[in-house]
Regions:
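Extracytoplasmic/periplasmic substrate-recognition and gating elements
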Residues: 56-57, 161, 225, 243-252, ...
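Long, aromatic- and glycine/proline-rich binding clefts that accommodate carbohydrate-like moieties
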Residues: 128, 292, 342-397, 401, ...
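Short helix-initiation/N-cap motifs at beta->coil->alpha
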Residues: 67-77, 96, 170-177, 252-267, ...
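Short, solvent-exposed loop/beta-turn-alpha elements that line the ligand-binding surface or hinge
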Residues: 111-125, 168, 187-196, 215-236, ...
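Extracytoplasmic/periplasmic solute-binding protein
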Residues: 135-144, 149, 159, 174-226, ...
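Conserved N-terminal structural module of periplasmic/extracytoplasmic solute-binding proteins
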Residues: 10, 14-106, 115-122, 137, ...
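Hinge/lid segment of periplasmic solute-binding proteins
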Residues: 93-150, 209, 293-295, 360-374
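Glycine-centered hinge/linker elements that transmit conformational signals in sensory
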Residues: 178-180, 223-255, 297
Length: 428
């Protein structure tokens, strides 16, 4: 069946009423549900469009979109709301963070809903997106996204420096040399005005480079008992990452980053490359001053990427579970994922949408979205555990100290391991 026809059929199915009896019952005559997300203005607009389309098809279900701009504020709001027993009916949760709520019984398992759905089937989704959201054998949330870390680059700056577009098989050395070439004092005053690279400094950012070098984040990925950042392979990768700043100076230092974030520099045309997942695309599409595209991560000893996936999760205390499921089901149908994909926000978790023009349209930037699909076979995940966010945050604090020259790599690794250790015993 042609792809376009299949998408149309999926859309028609989304409009039709579901006849099965859902675990949460049937929606009442008029139901009101809340849906909480985070992100910048462009991301908010994407979800506003999704909600608007849903309302047209389900006028009996009123959806209130709650938008929290900052990720840190969003995490705090989630914690407060769930602790108070007043969470939104539906929340977006990253696979690294949902376990903290699942372990407390705060999420409604969605596997039984999916099993009874006539609109969605587990086999329609990428396994790589679904598996991380299985907690103790049960699917807890429905993933919308199968992104990975990539290199966004300013093509105009590449051309001005005489650089070709990054090749699919470029190496760490190629990456570093490119960043060096792009780092420039453009006005001759002795200060760097244009950096070659910008990145968040976190365990999540350095992880794929550790894997590429043959190392790992923890001792046993399925049943971790400690961070394994002190192995030779992991340490070497961390040193390489830290040297991008302390040795090669191709990224802003702490003072420069505080004055203007790397992402802002990229948006303003004064940064050659920026590491991010797909979620930055709606914002980057507002760029009018230069051409840009996306490239895969450079390769180390082996190829490896890191999963960036979030999912629609339902609060266990929701009083409108049937209505909430109806929205989640629509959002992850062919039609719903098509809506979000065209905004640039996601790498769709539905195979049919990921392979469609909604995602791969070469006329919509980035032109090389195929990069994200090509990386799927090499995607890896962090451990799925209740306390991983705490571990990641503490390790990130120490990595920042090393990255900005406030500690050696060995000091940062030792401190990260020691500070994180209590959280391994506290996780289910």
């Amino acid at each position: 069946m042609p792809l376009t026809l299949r998408l149309i059929l999926l859309a028609l199915i989304a409009i039709a009423p579901v006849a099965c009896t859902l675990p949460g019952g049937s929606p009442t005559a008029t139901s009101s549900i809340s849906f909480m997300v985070f992100g910048d203005a462009a991301e908010k607009a994407a979800y506003e469009r999704l909600v608007a389309e849903f309302r047209q098809r389900h006028p009996d279900i009123d959806v209130t979109l709650i938008h929290i701009p900052g990720q840190s504020d969003y995490r705090k709001r989630l914690g407060v709301d769930f602790a108070a027993g007043t969470p939104a009916d539906i929340v977006l949760l990253n696979y690294r963070r949902y376990a903290a709520f699942a372990a407390k019984g705060a999420l409604e398992p969605l596997g039984p809903y999916l099993d009874q759905s006539t609109l969605l089937s587990p086999g329609d989704f990428y396994t790589e997106a679904m598996t991380p959201f299985i907690w103790k054998g049960v699917l807890m949330c429905i993933p919308q996204n199968l992104s990975s870390l990539a290199v966004y680059y300013n093509r105009d700056l590449f051309r001005a420096a005489g650089l070709p577009d990054p090749s699919p098989d470029w190496t760490w050395d190629d990456f570093l040399q490119t960043a060096r070439t792009l780092t420039q004092d453009t006005d001759g005053d002795g200060d760097i005005d244009q950096y070659g690279l910008g990145t968040e400094v976190s365990l999540f950012r350095v992880a794929p480079f550790i894997w590429q070098n043959g190392g790992d984040l923890v001792d046993h990925p399925q049943t971790p008992t400690r961070l394994a950042l002190d192995t030779p392979a992991a340490r070497e990768a961390i040193q390489w990452f830290v040297d991008l700043q302390v040795k090669h100076r191709v990224t802003p230092d702490a003072v420069a980053e505080a004055a203007e974030s790397s992402e802002s520099r990229f948006l303003n045309g004064r940064l050659g490359m920026f590491l991010n997942s797909r979620r930055g695309v709606p914002t980057y599409r507002t760029i009018t001053g230069f051409d840009w595209d996306v490239a895969p991560l450079p390769q180390g000893r082996q190829r490896a990427g890191i999963l960036h996936a979030d999912a629609f999760c339902m609060a266990q205390v929701s009083r409108q579970k049937a209505a909430a499921w109806t929205f989640i089901e629509f959002a992850n149908s062919g039609e719903g994922q098509h809506i979000i994909a065209t905004t640039g926000r996601t790498v769709p978790s539905l195979r049919i949408v990921a392979g469609s023009p909604a995602f791969l349209d070469p006329q919509a930037r980035p032109a090389n979205s195929q990069v994200f699909l090509d990386s799927i076979p090499f995607i890896r995940t962090v451990p799925i555990m209740e306390t991983w966010v705490d571990i990641e945050d503490l390790a990130g604090e120490e990595l920042k100290r090393a990255f900005y020259g406030q500690a050696t790599v060995d000091q940062a690794i030792a401190a990260a391991i020691a500070r994180a250790q209590p959280f391994f015993g506290a996780s289910q």
